[in-house]
């Protein structure tokens, strides 16, 4: 049920409806893009449509109706307002074609994979050119290793990052992770941060497995986490470097935010107002930030009152774009101190305005809009 008592039905992932909803309900969204046969960027995650076709082998007109072009999303005023005026964030994930599709060089031609990434960058660059979004509000990332080299061969102001470890574009959830396991073991989270920094990537997307659970102890090298000395080690090593973590579940969301990290959530149901930790849930820590007093007030609310309290505070708490300059400076200064951000306050404030936040700001991001809704478990 939502605030009006109506039953909420989650929109299909990566649809315009899901992405607009997610953008309005949290600090931003992540979406997946593929390049159709007629060079249109379309919203779709899986390597095949639900009818078994490779999206890259079909034109936009031939694709199923549920596969929408990115232009349809960018025509939505609510989406654009949140992104360009209210500090919300957009993560564009580029998907590589399945090698058996025959596109992007098939199984062996790495040069063609790079060319495919270049074509996607060029198309997105042209589509986004008329939109006035801040530099720190957008990133393009991909599991395709050639994304970084491709970005250097295209004239663009967009920022790029790699998803690591490399999850292949072929296989099912199990086989993809079996192939990626050696890379996971050989690369601790600090080592991944070093690689991202060397590539001048503005952030690091990573799996929760690096930070929580048995798997977090498997990586060689210095391990980090969300509690105790592991958290202290993470904060000290990170120095504010942005880390975006998926999945951000009910049992980890508050820990991620308290660590100064960004979480990608698959749950934005209106009734999801209580986390497993017992805390009331707040899905706009960046674009509608709580003061210390407001956080104490919300944390002190009995569980049975979470729904009404959260909805009440959504109406009362001042959103980022309506804060005074002094209030924004206070938030940035407080966050810098709390999480040991390395960059000087002047550099942070250059990225800070009514319509933007610095890269370091922790957020809640809607994964594929309102969450994944297909069987394949990859991000």
Regions found by a protein language model. Give the residues of each.
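Phosphate-group recognition and catalysis centered on beta-loop-alpha active-site segments
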Residues: 1-379
């Amino acid at each position: 049920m939502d605030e009006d008592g109506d039953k909420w039905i989650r929109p299909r992932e990566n649809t315009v409806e899901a992405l607009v909803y997610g953008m309005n309900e949290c600090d931003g969204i992540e979406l997946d893009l593929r390049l159709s046969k007629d060079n249109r960027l379309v919203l779709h995650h899986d390597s095949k449509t639900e009818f078994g076709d490779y999206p890259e082998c079909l034109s936009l007109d031939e694709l199923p109706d549920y596969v929408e072009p990115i232009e349809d999303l960018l025509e939505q005023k609510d989406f654009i307002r949140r992104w360009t005026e209210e500090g919300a964030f957009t993560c564009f994930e580029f998907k590589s074609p399945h090698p058996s599709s025959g596109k992007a060089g098939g199984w062996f031609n790495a040069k063609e994979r790079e060319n495919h990434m270049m074509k996607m960058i060029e198309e997105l660059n042209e589509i986004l050119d008329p939109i006035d979004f801040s530099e720190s509000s957008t990133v393009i990332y991909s599991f395709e290793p050639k994304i970084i080299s491709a970005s250097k061969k295209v004239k663009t102001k967009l920022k790029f990052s790699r998803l690591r470890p490399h999850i292949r574009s072929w296989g099912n959830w199990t086989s993809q992770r079996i192939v990626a396991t050696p890379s996971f073991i050989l690369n601790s989270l600090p080592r991944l941060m070093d690689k991202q920094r060397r590539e001048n990537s503005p952030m690091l997307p990573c799996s929760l497995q690096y930070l929580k659970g048995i798997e977090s102890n498997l990586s060689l090298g210095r391990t980090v986490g969300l509690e105790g000395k592991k958290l202290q080690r993470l904060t000290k090593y990170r120095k504010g470097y942005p880390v975006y973590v998926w999945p951000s579940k009910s049992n980890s969301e508050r820990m991620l935010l308290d660590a100064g990290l960004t979480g990608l959530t698959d749950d934005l149901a209106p009734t999801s107002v209580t986390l497993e930790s017992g805390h009331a849930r707040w899905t706009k820590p960046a674009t509608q930030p709580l003061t210390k007093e407001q956080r104490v007030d919300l944390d002190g609310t009995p569980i049975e009152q979470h729904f009404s309290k959260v909805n009440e505070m959504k109406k009362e708490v001042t959103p980022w774009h309506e804060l005074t300059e002094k209030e924004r400076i206070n938030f940035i200064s407080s966050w810098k101190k709390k999480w040991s951000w390395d960059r000087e306050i002047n550099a942070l404030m250059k990225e800070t305005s009514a319509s933007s936040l610095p890269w370091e700001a922790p957020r809640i991001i809607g994964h594929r809009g309102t969450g994944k809704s297909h069987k394949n478990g990859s991000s």
